[in-house]
UniProtKB/Swiss-Prot annotation:
Belongs to the RapZ-like family. GTP binds at D60, A61, R62, N63. Displays ATPase and GTPase activities. Pfam families: PapZ_C, RapZ-like_N. The keyword Nucleotide-binding applies. The keyword Transmembrane does not apply. ATP binds at G8, R9, S10, G11, S12, G13, K14, S15. Keywords: ATP-binding, GTP-binding, Nucleotide-binding. This is Nucleotide-binding protein PSPTO_4456.
């Protein structure tokens, strides 16, 4: 049986996450009281109609504070039943959450006459602290639109073929912000930039003209070898420490050329020695 617990601050994309999981065969329960988590898991296990139970539940700040405080004990109880249980935590920066609430005109679950929206958003982080501390996967949705979020959820949650650490190697452009949910970040802006070659500007690091140009640069090859040596040594240590998810981000200026090229190469070589290696290009349209 597989269970995914979805949590996060209001406006971060929890409803979208449940929609994606439901579309892919999960039985979803929104706003489950944390105290009922072990009972729900037990009932799903004994339900003979479910050959391979897939269960997703949303637990967030609408819970009683006392239930959230007991979340670590509830999670231990679920996992003691040999259930593969992942905790997904979604978040976005405060300005983005404020903007989303302003656009939808929805009421924040913690807002009151004496508590502003900004205060409610900040208080939510404190309430969800026990879940944040135990999250296996954190996704920051600040720079993601609806379709990008759906794709990210499918890649990280549904393309994980077996238990163990899932490694995501992600290219990005610094001009759109650094991915705050990355565990390791490599800055490759010091490398020769194909953008300044007019004949290469409209190509990406996935296309042969850019590949040929970058593969001929000694600095690029040296950077690749250094990053690969580091990851090849230390990623198995992450896996040995029972981490469920590790994100490695490779950044250049725009996220179209250098970071894409290196991310593709690293993904190809690391897939030969590690299981569950995924590649994503955040800023390629």
């Amino acid at each position: 049986m597989r269970m995914i617990i979805v949590s996060g601050r209001s406006g971060s994309g929890k409803s979208t996450a449940l929609d994606v999981l439901e579309d892919n065969g999960f039985y979803c329960v929104d706003n489950l009281p944390a105290g009922l988590l072990p009972e729900l898991a037990e009932r799903a296990l004994i339900n003979t109609e479910l050959a391979e139970p897939l269960l997703a539940v949303s637990i967030d700040a609408r819970n009683l504070p006392s239930h959230l405080t007991r979340f670590p004990q509830m999670l231990d109880e679920v996992r003691s039943r040999n259930i593969q249980c992942d905790v997904l935590y979604l978040d976005a920066d405060e300005a983005t959450l404020l903007k989303r609430f302003s656009e939808t005109r929805r009421r924040h679950p913690l807002s009151t006459a004496d508590r502003s929206l900004a205060e409610a958003i900040r208080d939510e982080t404190t309430l969800l602290g026990p879940i944040i501390d135990l999250a296996d996967l954190k996704i920051n949705t600040t720079h993601l639109n609806l379709y990008q979020l759906r794709d990210a959820l499918k890649l990280r949650l549904l393309n994980k073929p077996e238990p163990g650490t899932a490694f995501l190697i992600e290219s990005f452009g610094f001009k759109r912000g650094m991915p705050v949910d990355a565990d390791l970040v490599f800055d490759v802006r010091c490398l020769p930039n194909p953008y300044w070659k007019p004949e290469l500007r409209d190509h990406s690091g996935l296309e042969q003209p850019v590949i040929d140009y970058l593969s001929a640069q000694a600095d690029v090859e040296e950077m690749f070898q250094d990053i690969f040596s580091y990851l090849n040594k230390w990623l198995p240590r992450f896996a040995a420490s029972n981490r469920s998810y590790v994100t490695i981000a490779i950044g250049c200026t725009g996220g179209h050329h250098r970071s894409v090229y290196l991310t593709e190469r690293l993904g190809q070589v690391l897939q030969q020695s590690l299981k569950n290696v995924q590649v994503r290009h955040r800023d390629l349209s």
